């Protein structure tokens, strides 16, 4: 039996993870569930999975959950705050931690799990975007195992030889015969929208992804392709890739989730339905394969698979992310922080869709880069970039 902490259990990845757990009660049990404010969903999950701990990041939500559970004969202890998130991520009874908290808030609990040598199923992009080198070095130092859950990185992982899989963060792609990682992206809902119309895109249009079911923030990131930019940065750290070893390509159908091109001309691709239960099941069961509930591809119905080069005029946020990737961890931390604030402002109707790029660009242009050698430095840059982004949004909204 493998015992799990699910960080972000009420979100899209968390729901899919619990679906896999539900299908394999003989293999997986839940020690802890965490969420921000989703009291009703958390209560339902506590009644079904009987976790030892339920953590609500929001204190008022924790109080509400405790009151809601009071009438039930559960031994679930309700906790709140960042320290509690780190506590359940590092708990001695936990074998696997699903790191699925969206945003910078997921960094500290993911690092807490790493420092206790856990198997970390990494769905939180920001852990690597903000602290890639520190995070991978810590995983090596504490003998923690990282398994990528993002569909693209999980696909790349599956297409790599065993020696590269076992040395994430330090693998030598060239020695493994790899020429290039091909990171695929659908291009989002505005792939064919005229550039002149992008400034008038609404939040409702931006969150309507053509292929994937995702949360609102990640859906907007997919529309700007900032999501692919963050994945580009992740790929650099996970697979120890050089600038010449990663390429982004548009693949509208989202059937091929990414590819690895080898020196001999071979290209290995991982294919499947656009359903996150597939990479989650792969990571949970690794190195074995477990049922995910996802129906296999019917190749008689797949039809055309097409590929397009990236148009950086259409996706300037992706260009910013790639540039930040090679500028250093200070730049990627600032990029991520400014983007989180800008996307939230867009979803709240404070700025337009194309102004997300404007805010992020302005923050990156003005923020003084500092040496990054510890988490405190990263969090300081994160805070400064968020403040600057708020200030720029205030000026844009006037």
From Swiss-Prot:
One record GO biological process: isopentenyl diphosphate biosynthetic process, methylerythritol 4-phosphate pathway involved in terpenoid biosynthetic process
GO molecular function: 1-deoxy-D-xylulose-5-phosphate reductoisomerase activity; manganese ion binding; NADPH binding
Positions bound to NADPH: 10-13, 124, 126, 215
Binding-site list for Mn(2+): 150, 152, 231
UniProt-listed Pfam families: DXP_redisom_C, DXP_reductoisom, DXPR_C
Enzyme class, spelled out: oxidoreductase
EC number: 1.1.1.267
Keywords from the named record: Isoprene biosynthesis, Manganese, Metal-binding, NADP, Oxidoreductase
Cofactor(s) the record lists: Mg(2+); Mn(2+)
Catalytic reactions of this protein: 2-C-methyl-D-erythritol 4-phosphate + NADP(+) = 1-deoxy-D-xylulose 5-phosphate + NADPH + H(+)
Xref: NCBIfam families: Dxr, PRK05447.1-1, PRK12464.1
Function (record text): Catalyzes the NADPH-dependent rearrangement and reduction of 1-deoxy-D-xylulose-5-phosphate (DXP) to 2-C-methyl-D-erythritol 4-phosphate (MEP).
Family, as annotated: Belongs to the DXR family.
Descriptive protein name: 1-deoxy-D-xylulose 5-phosphate reductoisomerase
Organism encoding this protein: Tolumonas auensis (strain DSM 9187 / NBRC 110442 / TA 4)
Gene: dxr
